């Protein structure tokens, strides 16, 4: 025992490394078997739907096989024992360090295995690389086969060692899994074109294997592509959502408040009589079809309803819930608990009364028809204010009044529906960041938003708006909305926010490119052949 614990003989330690590598290999094989058993057939097999556990098993398997099997065997075993024997070399220097380095491995393996079964851990899965474990993974640059082929043709005439190495590094460093989160539906393609290189016209990638200094200017081509994915009802921690794992009271509350905010902006409570004399009811949220990802997120969180694009030329998509029982069971409780803050509360109140009348078995069909027709004939009163503001006597005089009614989750949702992050021209050579939310009605809502975000309400001829280009206010807005939004507004915000601190020479040209980029992104529409519902 003393020999194995305290030996500084390279052959003894090499033997220990080889034994340890065999032991680690058996553990890694067990993880591998678990993974393959889970993937052997469709659906959930043995882990009972625990995606968090599945992710950490994958990561633990990789770590064990590489760092505790391959490296100890090749470096510790062969390096300490077999290589010196083969070449007739003496034992290594620093023999005590050689001993210590081995005995640090067993506790490391134990800690790794223990962490693999911590249910609330990070669950890094395929996103072990720190860059990929951040929210920016949604926008990770990736090259598809067409781009790689095209760039290969451009490089062909002047292909050399430098360009080949850069080309290979691009593939290894930038081609990553785009659906890591399980909800990633958007991919960014990026090509950086360098200048100041005499021996090559185009380099693909951001890594340079050269002795020369390469100066680049960020002419970036971005394409946002919709990628159909399946959503998990209980997403794993790896997804790193604003609402985390989709479990727990706080997450549910945040989502519901956010949904009410989205509905206050782009939602509709609709009921009408069909040609057949039947009353139909629907709760729906409309978005530009380039933001269809947001609608699928709502559908996955609620677990009911459908997303449809009636015709791609309309440039709109809708999330709808038409089933009366689903509306009563899932939709009404949300809006009763977290009331609408805009005048849409009036329509919701009529909608709720109508649907409860329709579901009342004690009424005859004629009575139902008369009562619902009366509700349908009602119109919105002038200067209507949602009852949610009764708590502050329909007056917002301080930020405390505003925050007692309007939550951050609601404001995030409302901003995704009605807000705008953009860049505006302030002079011949001056572009600045701007933020704006506008409304035709509901002045009290804009007053509350203005107090929370520390900006002012401006009254126009036909509408009211909260808008600012003030440097300090924009800083506060960037901080307030950091890592919060779910739809394509998150992409617009990210590009807008990351360009805010650009200073010095070339700022105007840089801001012009960002402005054009944001306009191009907003102009993206679904392919004309898209018919998914």
UniProtKB/Swiss-Prot annotation:
Residues 1-128 are annotated as: COX1 exons 1 and 2 encoded. It is a multi-pass membrane protein. One of its GO terms (biological process) is intron homing. GO terms for molecular function: cytochrome-c oxidase activity; endonuclease activity; heme binding. The keyword Ubl conjugation does not apply. The mature protein may arise from proteolytic cleavage of an in-frame translation of COX1 exons 1 and 2 plus intron 2, containing the aI2 open reading frame. GO terms for cellular component: mitochondrion; respiratory chain complex IV. It comes from the Eukaryota. Residues 129-533 are annotated as: COX1 intron 2 encoded. Its EC number is 3.1.-.-. Gene3D superfamilies: Cytochrome c oxidase-like, subunit I domain, Homing endonucleases. It is found in: Mitochondrion; Membrane. InterPro entries: Cyt_c_oxase-like_su1_dom (IPR023616), Cyt_c_oxase-like_su1_sf (IPR036927), Cyt_C_Oxase_1 (IPR000883), Homing_endonucl (IPR027434), LAGLIDADG_dom (IPR004860). Keywords: Endonuclease, Hydrolase, Intron homing, Membrane, Mitochondrion, Nuclease, Transmembrane, Transmembrane helix. The chain crosses the membrane at residues 15-35, 56-76, 99-119, 135-155. Mitochondrial DNA endonuclease involved in intron homing. In the C-terminal section; belongs to the LAGLIDADG endonuclease family. In the N-terminal section; belongs to the heme-copper respiratory oxidase family. This is Probable intron-encoded endonuclease aI2. It comes from Mycosarcoma maydis (Corn smut fungus).
């Amino acid at each position: 025992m003393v020999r194995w614990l305290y030996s500084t003989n390279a052959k003894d330690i090499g033997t220990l490394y080889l034994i340890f590598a065999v032991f680690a290999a058996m553990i890694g094989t067990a993880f591998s078997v678990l993974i393959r058993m889970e993937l052997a057939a469709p659906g959930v097999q043995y882990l009972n739907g625990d995606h968090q556990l599945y992710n950490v098993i994958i990561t633990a398997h990789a770590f064990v096989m590489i760092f505790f099997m391959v490296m100890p065997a090749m470096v510790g075993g062969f390096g300490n024992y077999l290589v010196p024997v083969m070449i007739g070399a003496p034992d290594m220097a620093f023999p005590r360090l050689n001993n210590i380095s081995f005995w640090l491995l067993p506790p490391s393996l134990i800690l790794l295995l223990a962490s693999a079964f911590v249910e609330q851990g990070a669950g890094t899965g395929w996103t072990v690389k720190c860059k990929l474990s951040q929210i920016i993974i949604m926008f990770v640059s990736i090259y598809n086969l067409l781009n790689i082929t095209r760039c290969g043709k451009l490089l062909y005439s002047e292909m050399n060692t430098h360009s080949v190495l850069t080309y290979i590094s691009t593939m290894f460093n930038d081609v990553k899994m785009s659906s890591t989160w399980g909800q990633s539906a958007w991919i960014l393609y990026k090509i950086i074109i360098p200048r100041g290189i005499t021996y090559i016209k185009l380099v693909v990638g951001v890594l340079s294997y050269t002795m020369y200094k390469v100066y680049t200017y960020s002419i970036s081509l971005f394409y946002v592509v919709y990628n159909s994915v399946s959503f998990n009802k209980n997403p794993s921690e790896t997804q790193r959502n604003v609402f985390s794992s989709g479990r727990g009271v706080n997450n549910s509350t945040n989502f519901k408040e956010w949904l009410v905010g989205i509905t206050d902006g782009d939602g509709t409570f609709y009921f009408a009589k069909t040609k057949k004399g039947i009353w139909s009811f629907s709760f729906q949220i409309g978005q530009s079809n380039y933001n269809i990802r947001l609608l699928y997120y709502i559908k996955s969180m609620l677990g009911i309803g459908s997303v449809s694009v009636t015709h791609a030329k309309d440039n709109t998509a809708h999330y709808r819930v038409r089933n009366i029982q689903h509306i009563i069971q899932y939709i009404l409780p949300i809006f009763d608990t977290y009331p609408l803050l805009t005048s849409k509360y009036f329509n919701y109140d009529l909608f709720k009364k109508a649907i409860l009348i329709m579901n009342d078995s004690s009424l005859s069909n004629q009575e139902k028809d008369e009562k619902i027709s009366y509700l349908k004939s009602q119109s919105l009163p002038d200067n209507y204010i949602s009852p949610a503001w009764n708590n502050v006597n329909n007056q917002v005089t301080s930020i405390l009044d505003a925050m007692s009614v309007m939550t951050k989750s609601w404001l995030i949702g409302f901003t995704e529906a009605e807000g705008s992050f953009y860049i505006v021209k302030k002079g011949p050579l001056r572009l600045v960041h701007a933020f704006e939310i506008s409304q035709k009605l509901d002045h009290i809502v804009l007053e509350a938003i203005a107090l929370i975000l520390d900006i002012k309400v401006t009254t126009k001829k036909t509408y009211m708006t909260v808008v600012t280009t003030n440097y300090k206010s924009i800083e506060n807005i960037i901080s307030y909305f950091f890592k919060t939004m779910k739809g394509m507004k998150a992409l617009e915000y990210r590009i807008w926010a990351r360009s805010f601190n650009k200073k010095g020479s070339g700022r105007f040209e840089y801001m012009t490119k960002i402005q054009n980029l944001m306009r191009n992104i907003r102009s993206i529409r679904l392919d004309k052949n898209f018919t998914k519902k």
